[in-house]
Regions:
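Extended, compositionally biased alpha-helical segments that mediate assembly or anchoring
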Residues: 487-539
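Long, well-structured alpha-helical subdomains associated
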Residues: 402-498
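An active-site-proximal "capping" alpha-helix that borders the catalytic cofactor pocket
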Residues: 187, 390-407
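Short, glycine/acidic-rich hinge or "gate" loops at secondary-structure transitions
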Residues: 188-195, 278, 379-381, 410-425
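Active-site recognition of the HExxH zinc-binding catalytic motif
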Residues: 356-373, 397, 402
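Contiguous, non-catalytic segments that form substrate-binding/exosite surfaces or channel walls
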Residues: 158-349, 353
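N-terminal helix-rich structural modules
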Residues: 1-185, 189-193
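Post-HEXXH active-site segment of zinc metalloproteases
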Residues: 372-395
């Protein structure tokens, strides 16, 4: 219990940091709203606003028309959120890096915050470095680099998250250390991971924590904590945002699933590209029930595979965390199924199942481990493809999952009905209830798949109502062709080629997509999922 309390405390810090990363006015707006709610004679209205804040992780909501609008008195968020100066655009960054190539590594680091070189910013960073000597010790040369920067508001520089968020990360480390001390004898591997990850938060180098996380034997509890995913960076698509997930392992389901993970090399070798790699015959796959999620992880997140770092994955592998009480939740699945049934012809409506969703999701996560990891010239995909990197990587993983399905059927992982359910969920995944915004990589790549599938005859309008028919006999051929294109883009690392590909397949026709979206809106009971946790205050 002591360890859990400490881990939850660390998670709350990740939540606050994430909200701070998203919007500079978020925390003040939340505090004001809390005070209004406490003082309200009739708290229903403020309670509704608190629910909105909780659902959208800040003071900006997504409307039913997919617009982003503040619902508290705050400004609109910047594309780069608070990780870049307000008003900074990509051309200015590109120009700056062309004239200051030595700044490239720090400006483009996934865990750095970009600032303008004002006297106030530089003085504040140096003062914080004085206040947190532990950060200075873990970042040799940082002080000298900051002192060497000339004051120039037109110039840019970057500081590590460890300095920008030193007070919060120092406190989070203390909580992780205390949790580790409480479980040292019971689960030494988990304790070692917590010690390492606490240090990682302040060093910015996650290798020690990643290594002990992926290779350790933890027992019942697991914790994902730190800054990994960059989906919220709509400027460059490279900055990582904070999250935490406290998870309880379902041992029986985990063992059954691990026994099935035996054909990874065969699945890798079957992918439609020439540059195959050796993959580990076993990767840690765990089925968990979510105890609490924080920050970017909060919501109906079904699964995760980490670490993202290609070098860490090569050396230590990756860990897959399946969130069973989200993925297998009957109410959530029923809402998903309603969307599918609203747009497919009657004879296809029973093809979707919870098991099909589970398997497609599982192999999507494993798909991140397979295929291209770095470009032909050795660059990371994030560096090469920038704001398109997440979109292309997520599409690759969707397609790897579908491409693997026939192999899974051949080895007896599931039967013909299981294969069909896996495929049906692949179509369900592409359905959109509104037109995606340009900064929504998940929804955009789903729409692109739908359009490719439609143009290549995998799905087509059926009957007078123009409901969708699924041509299962075309499935593997069409998926293979699209996956081949995606792998080619990743290997080439060509930004302009990738942009042309996205522009080609990212389109919306109200007569087709709009009509299907209307059918979904008419049938779906809910447009969002508000996830609450029994162990938390949930506001």
């Amino acid at each position: 219990l002591e360890a859990v309390d400490e881990l939850l405390a660390a998670g709350r810090i990740m939540q606050a940091l994430y909200e701070q990363q998203l919007h500079e006015e978020a925390r003040v707006a939340k505090q004001t709203l809390d005070e209004l709610h406490a003082a309200a004679a009739d708290p229903e209205a403020t309670g509704n606003l608190l629910d909105l804040y909780y659902l959208f992780k800040g003071p900006v909501a997504t409307t039913l028309d997919n617009e982003r609008l503040p619902f508290l008195p705050v400004g609109s968020p910047n594309p780069g959120k608070t990780l870049y100066p307000a008003g900074l655009a990509r051309p200015e960054i590109d120009t700056f890096l062309e004239t200051h190539p030595s700044a490239r590594d720090t400006i483009l680091a996934e865990r750095s915050l970009v600032r303008r070189a004002t006297a106030e910013s530089l003085a504040g960073d140096l003062a914080r470095l004085d206040d947190y000597p532990g950060v200075a010790e873990l970042h040799p040369g940082l002080r000298g680099r900051l002192e060497a920067i000339d004051e120039d508001p037109a110039s840019l520089y970057a500081v590590p998250y460890a300095l920008a968020y030193a007070p919060q990360l120092t406190e989070a480390r203390r909580h992780l250390e205390r949790a580790a001390e409480a479980i040292e004898e019971e689960t030494p591997d988990f304790a070692a991971y917590l010690h390492n990850r606490g240090r990682d938060l302040l060093s910015g180098d996650y290798e020690s924590g990643d290594a002990s996380w992926v290779t350790g034997e933890f027992g019942n509890l697991n914790l994902q904590v730190g800054s990994y995913e960059s989906y919220d960076d709509n400027l460059l698509g490279i900055k990582a945002f904070y999250s935490a997930s406290l998870l309880a392992r379902d041992e029986a389901r985990s063992r059954a699933l691990a026994a099935a993970m035996t054909e990874l090399q065969a699945i890798e070798d079957a992918l439609p590209y020439e540059h195959h790699k050796r993959v580990r015959s076993h990767i840690p796959v765990g089925v968990y029930n979510v105890v609490a999620d924080f920050g970017q992880a909060r919501g109906a997140n079904t699964a995760t595979i980490l670490p993202n770092d290609a070098d860490h994955a090569r050396k230590y592998g990756r860990i897959v965390l399946i969130r069973n009480n989200i993925l297998g939740n009957p109410a959530i699945f029923e809402n998903v199924k309603q969307r599918f049934e609203a747009v497919v012809a009657p004879e296809y409506r029973e093809h979707l199942s919870i098991d099909g969703s589970f398997n497609r999701t599982l192999w999507h996560e494993i798909g991140h481990y397979l295929g291209i990891s770095v470009t032909a010239d050795g660059r990371s995909l994030g560096e090469a493809l920038a704001d398109y990197a997440d979109l292309i990587e997520e599409m690759k993983s969707d397609l790897v999952s579908l491409h693997a399905a026939p192999t899974l059927r051949t080895i007896g992982y599931y039967d013909d009905q299981g294969l069909r359910a896996h495929y049906a969920d692949g179509i369900r995944r592409t359905l959109q209830v509104v037109r995606p915004r340009s900064e929504q990589p998940y929804q955009t790549m789903q729409l692109m798949q739908f359009n490719y599938f439609m143009e290549h005859g995998l799905i087509e309008p059926h009957g007078d109502a123009a409901l969708l028919a699924i041509n299962y006999d075309r499935y593997h051929e069409v998926v293979s062709a699209l996956l081949s294109e995606v792998l080619r883009l990743q290997y080439a690392g060509d930004y302009e080629m990738t942009r042309a590909f996205v522009e080609r397949w990212n389109y919306w026709d109200d007569r087709v997509h709009g009509r299907l979206a209307e059918l979904i809106q008419e049938q779906a009971s809910y447009r969002g999922t508000l996830v609450r946790y029994a162990i938390l205050e949930n506001r």
